[in-house]
């Protein structure tokens, strides 16, 4: 609802009071949770939901809850739940989550199997940088007023309204730029995903293009394989839109008539990432 408070962990090093967590099995083990207003939010919230795309063992979640309870004892008085798209948590770890007072819900529950062993025979490779070639027109189409930052915490109603307003303004300008009935890629950058999804959803609803697809760059290194039975068949290695020397990836690209990057990275169009992305889309 509009009164729901939302904050997500981040791997960005930002100013303020942050709680550091470790996700041992992750490609980027350290992530942070903004604590600037967390004590007040816990006091105001009768229930707290931890959301992830996938829970594999549940250990990271249990460790996070234990760490938060040590710092915020009132968390022990709150209802806790975990929600995910996928869950492959074993029955033993499901019992540990229940003992920790965490109710779990998922959309798809996978059998607890050794998935790593199941893919050992598949010849995968890491994504490579795109080949260099002629670049299409690169420019900043629209700079919105700064949106509320979910890394530091937002009220859901305010955040979704701001994202919707920015998307409407952006698409009103985009109508003059796109070929009729073309294919549009809307691309988020790393943790800046929801604004891109909002733009893509609105573009689809209004019939701006014949097809609209939404991607996001990611720090996750995933093996690619052209086999038709394998889900990730192509990918490119890109420098981060946020600068520095970290690697990011973009998977399963298709052919598009136009690509719209929705990002909170400063001066993104002037960086190497944008030119490399344009090269990848031109391949």
State each model region's role.
Residues 8-11, 58, 84, 108:
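Glycine-rich, histidine-containing beta strand-loop boundary motifs that form or position
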Residues 43-71:
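Intrinsically disordered, low-complexity linker/loop segments enriched in Gly/Pro
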Residues 1-2, 6, 49-50, 83-89:
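Hydrophobic, well-ordered secondary-structure segments
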Residues 15-20, 50-54, 73-76:
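A generic short-segment signal for beta-strand/edge and adjacent turn/coil regions
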Residues 3-48, 62, 217-256:
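Short, glycine/charge-rich flexible loops or terminal/linker lids adjacent to PRPP-binding catalytic cores
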Residues 66-182, 193-283:
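PRPP-dependent phosphoribosyltransferase catalytic core
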């Amino acid at each position: 609802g509009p009164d729901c408070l939302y904050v997500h962990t981040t791997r960005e090093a930002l100013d303020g009071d942050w709680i550091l967590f470790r996700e041992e099995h992750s490609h980027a083990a350290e992530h942070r949770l903004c604590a600037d207003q967390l004590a007040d939010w816990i006091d105001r919230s009768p229930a707290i939901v931890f959301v992830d795309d996938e829970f594999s063992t549940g250990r990271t979640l249990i460790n996070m809850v234990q760490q938060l309870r040590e710092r915020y004892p009132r968390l022990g008085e709150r209802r806790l739940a975990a929600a995910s798209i996928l869950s492959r948590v074993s029955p033993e770890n499901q019992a540990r989550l229940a003992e920790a007072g965490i109710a779990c819900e998922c959309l798809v529950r996978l059998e607890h199997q050794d998935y790593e062993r199941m893919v050992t025979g598949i010849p995968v490779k890491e994504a490579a940088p795109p080949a260099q070639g002629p670049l299409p027109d690169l420019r900043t189409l629209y700079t919105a007023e700064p949106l509320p930052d979910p890394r530091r915490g937002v009220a859901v109603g305010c955040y979704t309204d701001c994202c919707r307003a920015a998307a409407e303004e952006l698409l009103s300008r985009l109508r003059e730029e796109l070929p009729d009935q073309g294919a549009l890629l809307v691309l988020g950058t790393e943790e800046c995903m929801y604004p891109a999804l909002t733009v893509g959803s609105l573009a689809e609803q209004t019939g701006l293009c014949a097809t609209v697809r939404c991607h996001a760059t990611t720090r996750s290194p995933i093996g690619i394989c052209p086999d038709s039975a394998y889900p990730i068949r192509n990918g490119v290695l890109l420098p981060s839109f946020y600068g520095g020397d970290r690697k990011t990836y973009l998977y399963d690209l298709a052919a598009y008539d136009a690509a719209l990057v929705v990002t909170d990275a400063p001066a993104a169009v002037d960086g190497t990432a944008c030119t490399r992305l344009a090269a990848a889309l031109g391949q």
